[in-house]
Amino acid sequence: MREKTLYARLAWTGMRKNRRLYLPCLLSCAGMVLMFYILMGLSGSPVLEHMSGGGSSAIILRLGTVVIAVFALIFLFYTHSFLIRRREREFGLYNVLGMGKGNIARILLWETVITYGLTTGTGLLLGMVLYKLAELGMVRLLQVPVTYTLTVSVSSLLAAAALFAAIHTLILLNGLRQLHGVSAVGLLRSESVGEKPPKAQWVLTAAGAVLLAGAYWLAVSIREPLAALTWFSAAVLMVIAATYLLFISGSVTLCRGLQRNKKYYYRPQHFVSVSSMAYRMKRNGAGLASVCILATMVLVMISSTTCLYVGQEDAVNARYPRDLSVKVYGDRYLLDSEKLTQVRQGVESTIFNFGGNVSNVAEYRTISISGLVDGGNIRTDSSGASVSDSTRAVQIHILPLEDYNAATGQTLPLSDGQVYVAALRAEFDSDTLSIDGGMIRHVMKREIPMLGGPSAADITPSLMVVVPDFEQFVPALQDYFMEKYRSYPTVVWHYAFDTDLPENQQGNIDGTTPNLEDALNGYLAGVSSDWGVGVSVESKAANRADFYGMYGGLFFLGIMLSIVFIFAAVAILYYKQLSEGYEDQSRFDIMQKVGMTKQDIRRSINSQLLTVFYLPLVLAGVHLCFAFPFIHKLLILFNLDNRGLLIGTTAVSFAVFAVLYAIVYKLTGNTYYRIVAEDTEKE
């Protein structure tokens, strides 16, 4: 019986004696189990499922569970490799005392079982306790009524248990693989093997600098939001690769360059710090690069999602400038003034009969096509277009001059063959406008305001073209498309207005209250049946919930992922300080023996730690500054164009993160000095 429990007791004793190493790992793993359970549970929450905007939030949260699952796999592999490296000497001693690798493997198995049981059990227990708090916070973000029913998601419990069981199994197999390839002598001498001097790697350093410069150039040079979306992933990958190259190779290359400067290097205040820094960066460059990337991810997520959440009402108003919008999709009926008057009177009668008053009416017709801008020509045939051509894609909304003047209250003049052009998220500077080389019109050089609403929802850049002869232009355009593509665009009649009705009577929000949106849909259903046209009604009040659901979900996910990434960064920094503390114990002793005082040594080490520790924060701040134009353009795709708000949220996010970072430095720095003091105080 004692033999059966021997390996479990050895595993538990080893973990308990190395609790300084294991405790952060256990806490981090339990935290990831907790976050995964909460996000998984919320994504299938019946509370979110039955509320307006909950569907958008659920999709976003499901994506978050995938991110946490992938990140947990990578991060736990990293922490476990550190633990194994620190305990190789202990395992080597077991081997010398008579244990075979099979026996050590059984110890590792028990350690994995204990780790899995502690972390998964603790994480799921805390998850069940904190789940309702997270659900209440999510509901508050969506600005919907709160329910206080306590629930436990069994499916989320099973999914979390299965996921982390698989991760710990993979970690165990990797540990056994490492153990199999090392001899007993190698295990015993693993911590005393001499370290080769780091070499300058100019090629890798130059590659990192070029990649970083290229990513920064993309960030500041791209002007169109859709192009920013296209190139964002590429820029992110370039920044990640460049950060690792510069931290691992660039920092060592810099130190080697300083060592070649004899006037600078051979001074007491520089000699020790520069030579030691080269070794530090060689050992810890990858870890510091990971911290820098995690810090950048946190800053980008928090600043952008906070900006979205705070400015969500601005986004709603940009997409829906008026309370309700009616659309009728037809052809000859909308070019016939009598038919147009008939449907207008029907809409107005429906509004009056419901008891509402209208104001701020905007009524206009449009016909829309898409194409690629080529100077002043719009190429409608996209066959053979490449990915780079997506930056030239535009959506073109054509409307009559009289409708535009009526909707904006202006009296703009136009002659035959002339047009006005307004651009949204696009640039158009040509003196002429043509469609596939035909229908050439002269562009009048005058800035005109863009009509909001449908064009604000376009992901692609938009051009609004005002023509004086809409009734003649539309048939010619439709005939051309019919001949070339066997299909043609249709005319859309827009009727948007504000009303004095309460919001729950404007749109179908709760599904039970009689509302104007349903009344208009009822009338337009008859129009659609009689005329064979398409109809739609959009309510700002009803669609506001979807906006809040999406932006609230992104904000909540940003907070949750930021917490996970911050804990991961703290764990990496903690393990870095531990490893450096153990490695510097003997160096302190040697420095004292060659004549340096403890005060000089502490000053030198403190200088190195400050440089190494704050370098990721400084570079993350630089990354954030260059990412700002990218973030701003991506937010425009979410109908939010508020540069001042984004600057504010970005500045506050960086300031708060910097304070937290400084606190972590203080705490982990104390751990480093305690480890070093354990050796020096014995002298």
Enumerate the language-model features and the residues they cover.
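A short amphipathic helical element positioned immediately N-terminal to and/or at the very start
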Residues: 4-18, 272-280
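Basic-flanked hydrophobic alpha-helices used for secretion and membrane insertion
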Residues: 315-567
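Small-residue-rich transmembrane alpha-helices
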Residues: 31-45, 78-82, 89, 114-144, ...
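Juxtamembrane interface at the cytosolic side of transmembrane helices
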Residues: 78, 86, 178, 224, ...
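Short cytosolic juxtamembrane segments of multi-pass membrane proteins
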Residues: 1-6, 180-195, 582-583, 673-683
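Hydrophobic alpha-helical transmembrane segments of multi-pass inner-membrane transport and secretion
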Residues: 20-47, 56-92, 112-126, 206, ...
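Alpha-helical transmembrane segments, especially those used as permease/efflux helices
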Residues: 23-29, 34-38, 162-167, 195-308, ...
